[in-house]
Structures are given as C-alpha cells and as structure tokens.
C-alpha cells in the first residue's frame, strides 16, 4: 500500500520535511508528476538539501526512489541535482530509478517557455512560469509528438534514427513558430548521445517497479509536487502548472490503482503563500504580509522569487480536501506566527453581496470577493523548542483545533521549526 503526501495550497507548504520524516520507515519513495519546477528543502543534521526533480527519499540510505512516468525530466538538470546532493554526502548508487515512459524536457522547451511568457507579459497576461520548460513539454506530450526516455535509450534497430527524427521535427516546429529561435540539431544530438549512456543505468519499467513493490508489501510513499491549487484541472486556471497535482496525478503518474492508496496526507502552511501571478484572496499587501514574508523566509527554492503572503484560507483548504480526500493534515511553519498579536483565518467569501463557501472557478469573480475572517489572539511566545503537542500554548492549540473542525480532517503533525526534529506528532 502507498501513502501519499500532497500540497493543499499553492505549493511551498513544506512537503519535503514530512516526506523526510516518513521516509525513515519507507522502502520506496516515488515522484509522480511535475518536473524541476518544484522545490523541497530538507535539513538533515544541519546539512541543507534542495530537491527539485529528485525524490526526497534519497536522504534515507535504505530507501529506493522512483521518478515516475508522469514526471517530465530535463536530463542535464537531473545530473546536476544528483551531483549536488552526492557532493553533500548522499550515496544514491542503486537507489534512484527513472521511468522509461517519462517524457524528456529539452533546451528548446525551456526557450519556448520563456518566449511564450515574454509574449504574455507584453499583453499583461503573464502566468509567472518558472521557465523550466515544463508546460511546453506537457504540450508536446498531449499532442503525441513528445520524446520519452525509452526513445532515447532503446537498443532496438533504428531507435536512434527515430530519436533524431522526433527531435528534428520538434526543433523545426519551433523555428517556424519563432523566426529567431536558436537551436542546433547536431549539437543537441551530440549532447544526448552522451546523456543516453549516462541515464541508461537508471531506467526501469516503472509499472513493473511499482506493482512489484505493492505485491511484495513494501512501504511506499508518493511525493506530490506543486499543490492542488496549481492543478491543471482544479487550480486557479490558467495560473496553474501543466500537470495534475492532486490525487488523480498520483494514479496516472505511477500507473497504480486507487485500491493501492492507504493514507493521503495534506500539507498545509499555517498561513498562505503563492509564487507568480494569479488570484490570492487572503493576500496581505501590508505590514502583516511583509512580516510573514520576512520571518518565514518566503523565497522560492526553484526561482528565488519572493513569495506573496497572506492569512490561512479555509475556503481553499476545504476545496482541496474535497478533491484529494486527506486522511490527516500536517500544519507547517506554525512558529512563523509566534510574534503576531492577532492572527486571522479566512472562512468564507462574499461576492456581490452573497456569501460564497465554495471556491469559485471564475477568476473574475474570485478577484472581486471579499474575505470573511475569524480573528484569533496570538500566543506571542517562542514555540520552536517545544517537543510535545500538549505543551503548545493554549492559543496555538485553539488555532489548530479551529482548522480541524472547519475542514473535518484531523491534524497529525505540527511543524514548529525548519529541522526534521521540529515536527510534533498529535494523537488522532
């Protein structure tokens, strides 16, 4: 059976730390969607590891790690990230595997991404993409013109010729679309001949890999990237990523059935942040927002961009819970609220004089809602050294209990600091 860790907001909730804690007793950790547009930071014994594409389970020396078929992979970035974490002392030998069905991100995908974003910026409709080529790669996947890992590594006769043909067509299509598009086929082929041999030892049939693990009753943890509000179907479209970031993406990205899922853990930051463009009802463009940003060190792991900050939005969390079916929640970064005299939680929206308790799909309406808040007294004390949930200040527990009651899902963990030791487990 597989447990799943999913982001419940707009990403950057701190999923990596929960994955790190859970991986201490896990046999397999798998990524199911997204690419290196995501970012997790894990601190182990004072050493900081930044994960973008690779599964966070690599910090556990006994855990095998899979990049599933729903992930899109930029091979140069894959090897750069692998080298970076190995240089910090992680031995990944024989523990990292890549699905033969995963699609490849090429340099021209990344250039296309940036050119499209520049065009949108001129029309003031910028999405705020990371520029990593994720969207254009999923576009070629959907149009059935993409290149998968097996196209690159296959030893079948004429397989390299097919790879050349596919790559040539993709490059020519972009040259026709962008007259100034710079991408040389021969240099790309030379680069990928080298990468072909480097990636081969990592490649597996991910369907067989996952189902063997399920059959052998291995403990499996699936690490979702991004978050539900960035889902291509259920997020604040078009200000979303290009994959299914909810529970559906777990099934399609790994090729496992619903009955293989056990627990679904929703990770919730104690306030709300968002990177890039798009609606954000509880955003605080004031001293409170600046304080959250400063104390929370709210900068994107992947882009370095400053995150927009606001109060916790329970309309968003309730919506996310309905879709993903969380069995329990992990509240992160509660300590960021330590110095606030008052703390607010958004509980409903009002649009054109009417109360709205569900999340609107119409962004025009969403941009005009007024948020109804419940105000809580702060605890105004340092909680970073607290080791047991029961020892949290009374006002902190009231804040957490309100969240539980509103979304009707128990809180299982509370984060009170950056390290893996700063995770309080609550009896549920």
Swiss-Prot record:
The active site is at residues 12, 40. Pathway: Purine metabolism; AMP biosynthesis via de novo pathway; AMP from IMP: step 1/2. It catalyses: IMP + L-aspartate + GTP = N(6)-(1,2-dicarboxyethyl)-AMP + GDP + phosphate + 2 H(+). Substrate binds at residues 301-307. GO terms for molecular function: adenylosuccinate synthase activity; GTP binding; magnesium ion binding. SMART domains: Adenylsucc_synt. Binds 1 Mg(2+) ion per subunit. This is Adenylosuccinate synthetase. It comes from Komagataella phaffii (strain GS115 / ATCC 20864) (Yeast).
């Amino acid at each position: 059976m597989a447990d799943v860790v999913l982001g419940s907001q707009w990403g950057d909730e701190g999923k990596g730390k929960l994955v790190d804690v859970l991986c201490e007793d896990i046999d397999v950790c798998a990524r199911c969607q997204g690419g290196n547009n995501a970012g997790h930071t894990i601190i182990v014994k004072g050493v900081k590891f930044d994960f973008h594409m690779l599964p966070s389970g690599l910090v556990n020396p006994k855990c095998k790690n899979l990049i599933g078929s729903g992930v899109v992979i930029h091979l140069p970035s894959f090897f750069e990230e692998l080298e970076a974490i190995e240089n910090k002392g992680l031995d990944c030998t024989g523990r990292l595997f890549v699905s033969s069905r995963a699609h490849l991100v090429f340099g021209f995908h990344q250039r296309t991404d940036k050119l499209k974003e520049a065009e949108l910026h001129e029309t003031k409709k910028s999405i705020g993409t990371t520029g990593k080529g994720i969207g254009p790669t999923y576009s070629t996947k959907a149009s059935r013109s993409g290149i998968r890992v097996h196209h690159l590594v296959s030893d079948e006769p004429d397989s390299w010729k097919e790879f050349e043909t596919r790559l040539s067509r993709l490059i020519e299509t972009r040259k026709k679309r962008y007259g100034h598009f710079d991408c040389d086929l021969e240099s790309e082929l030379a680069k990928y001949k080298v990468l072909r041999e480097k990636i081969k030892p990592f490649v597996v049939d991910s369907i067989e890999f996952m189902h063997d693990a399920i059959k052998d009753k291995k403990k499996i943890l699936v690490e979702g990237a991004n978050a539900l509000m960035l889902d291509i179907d259920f997020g604040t479209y078009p200000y979303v990523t290009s994959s299914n970031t909810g529970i559906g993406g777990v099934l399609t990205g790994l090729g496992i059935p619903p009955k293989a899922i056990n627990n679904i853990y929703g990770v919730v930051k104690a306030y709300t942040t968002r990177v890039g463009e798009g609606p954000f009802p509880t955003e605080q463009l004031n001293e409170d927002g600046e304080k959250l940003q400063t104390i929370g060190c709210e900068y994107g792991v992947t882009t370095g961009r400053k995150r927009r900050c606001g109060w916790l939005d329970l309309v968003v969390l309730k919506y996310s819970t309905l879709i993903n079916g969380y069995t329990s929640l992990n509240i992160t970064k509660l300590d960021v609220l330590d110095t606030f005299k008052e703390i607010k939680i958004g509980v409903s929206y009002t649009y054109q004089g009417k109360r709205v308790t569900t999340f609107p799909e119409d962004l025009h309406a969403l941009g005009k809602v007024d948020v109804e808040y419940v105000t809580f007294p702060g605890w105004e004390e340092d909680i970073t050294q607290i080791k047991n949930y029961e020892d949290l200040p009374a006002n902190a527990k009231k804040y957490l209990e309100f969240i539980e009651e509103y979304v009707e899902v128990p809180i299982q963990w509370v984060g009170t600091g950056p390290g893996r030791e700063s995770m309080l487990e609550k009896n549920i």
